[in-house]
C-alpha cells in the first residue's frame, strides 16, 4: 500500500489501486489487430496493450519506443548483406539507385525487407538531400510524423535485424533519359545518363546493353577525360616499381622503360574507361563501347552521348561478419 505523510495512506492511493484492478482486459482480437498493424510478436503486443490500458494508438507508440531501443542494441552488428534497387521517374529523365544493407542474406531475400527498400527508393527519388545525414533527417513520405531515420529504426524492430540505408545516388538528364539495370536480384544496380535527341526502342536497348556492360566489367570512368592526373601518376609509380623489380626489365634504358610505362597505361585506360572497353556483345570481339553507341546513333539518325554512369554493388567496401550460428545463439542466450 502507498503511504502519505507519517505512514498514513495517500488519499490518491485507493484511486490508483482501483484503476489497477479495473484496467481494461486485453483480448485476443486486440492482440491480433496490433500484430497486424506492427508486425511485432504476440507477447510484445499483449504487454503493450496491458501497459497502455488497451489504447491501440498508445500501444503502437509503446512498441515503437521499445523497437527503437531494440534497434539501438542491434546497431552494433555489421550490416553487409542487403540489396541494391533502382527507380526511374515516369518521364524517364530522373532515376535513383539505393543500397540498403542487412546483416544476413536471409533477411535480404525477405519480402518485407525488399518492399521497404523500394519505399526507400521512392523517398530518394523525391529527395533533394545533398548527403546521407540530410536524407535521414527528412520526413518519411508515407508518414510525415516520422523521419527517414525513425522509420528505419521501426523497420529494424519489425524485421528483427540491423539494417542501414548506406547510400543513394540520383541522376537527371533533361536532354534524353536515364536508363537503369539491376543484376543478380539486387546485387548490382546501374544508372546510365544518356543524352540523345532520339528516344525509341533501339536507343533504349542500347542503353540497357551499356548498363549490362557496366555491371559485368565494372569500369571506373566513363572516358579518359574523367581520369585524374593523380590516378595516372599513381598507376605509373606502380608500373615503374614493377619494372624495377623485374631483373629482365630493370636493366633496360630509362627511355625504353618510360615507353613501356606509357604503353601499359594506355592499355589499362582501355580497361577502366567504359567507352574504351571492348563491347561485350561485339561480334568481332574488337568493337569498343563508343563504336557500338555510334553505330546505334547512325542507324537511328540520332546524336547520342553517354555522359556518365553510377554503379552500386551490395556490400562493396564493407567488412562481413563471420560468426557461426552456435556462437550467435550462445550470445543471444547470454552464454
Put a short name on every predicted segment:
Residues 12-20, 25-335:
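N-terminal assembly/interaction segments in proteins that build large macromolecular machines
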Residues 4-12:
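Intrinsically disordered, low-complexity segments enriched in serine/proline and basic residues
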Amino acid at each position: 500500500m502507498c503511504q502519505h505523510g507519517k505512514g498514513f495512506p495517500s488519499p490518491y492511493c485507493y484511486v490508483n489501486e482501483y484503476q489497477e484492478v479495473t484496467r481494461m482486459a486485453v483480448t485476443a482480437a486486440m492482440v491480433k489487430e496490433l500484430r497486424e498493424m506492427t508486425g511485432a510478436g504476440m507477447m510484445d503486443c499483449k504487454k503493450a496493450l496491458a501497459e497502455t490500458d488497451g489504447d491501440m494508438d498508445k500501444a503502437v507508440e509503446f512498441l515503437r519506443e521499445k523497437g527503437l531501443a531494440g534497434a539501438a542494441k542491434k546497431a552494433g552488428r555489421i550490416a553487409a548483406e542487403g540489396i541494391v534497387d533502382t527507380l526511374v521517374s515516369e518521364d524517364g529523365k530522373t532515376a535513383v539507385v539505393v543500397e540498403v544493407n542487412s546483416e544476413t542474406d536471409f533477411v535480404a531475400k525477405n519480402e518485407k525487407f525488399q518492399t521497404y527498400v523500394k519505399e526507400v527508393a521512392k523517398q530518394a527519388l523525391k529527395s533533394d538531400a545533398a548527403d546521407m545525414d540530410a536524407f535521414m533527417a527528412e520526413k518519411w513520405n508515407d508518414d510525415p510524423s516520422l523521419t527517414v531515420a525513425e522509420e528505419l529504426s521501426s523497420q529494424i524492430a519489425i524485421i528483427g535485424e540491423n539494417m542501414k540505408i548506406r547510400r543513394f545516388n540520383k541522376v537527371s538528364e533533361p536532354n534524353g533519359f536515364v536508363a537503369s539495370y539491376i543484376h543478380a536480384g539486387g546485387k548490382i544496380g546501374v544508372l546510365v545518363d544518356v543524352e540523345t535527341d532520339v528516344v525509341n526502342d533501339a536507343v533504349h536497348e542500347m542503353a540497357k546493353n551499356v548498363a549490362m556492360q557496366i555491371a559485368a566489367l565494372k569500369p571506373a570512368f566513363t572516358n579518359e577525360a574523367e581520369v585524374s592526373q593523380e590516378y595516372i601518376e599513381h598507376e605509373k609509380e606502380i608500373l615503374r616499381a614493377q619494372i624495377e623489380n623485374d631483373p629482365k626489365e630493370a636493366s633496360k634504358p630509362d627511355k625504353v622503360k618510360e615507353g613501356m610505362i606509357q604503353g601499359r597505361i594506355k592499355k589499362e585506360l582501355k580497361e577502366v574507361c567504359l567507352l574504351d572497353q571492348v563491347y561485350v556483345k561485339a561480334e568481332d570481339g574488337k568493337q569498343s563501347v563508343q563504336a557500338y553507341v555510334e553505330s546505334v546513333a547512325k542507324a537511328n539518325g540520332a546524336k547520342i552521348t553517354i555522359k556518365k554512369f553510377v554503379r552500386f554493388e551490395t556490400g562493396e567496401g564493407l567488412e562481413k561478419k563471420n560468426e557461426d550460428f552456435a556462437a550467435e545463439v550462445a550470445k543471444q542466450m547470454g552464454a
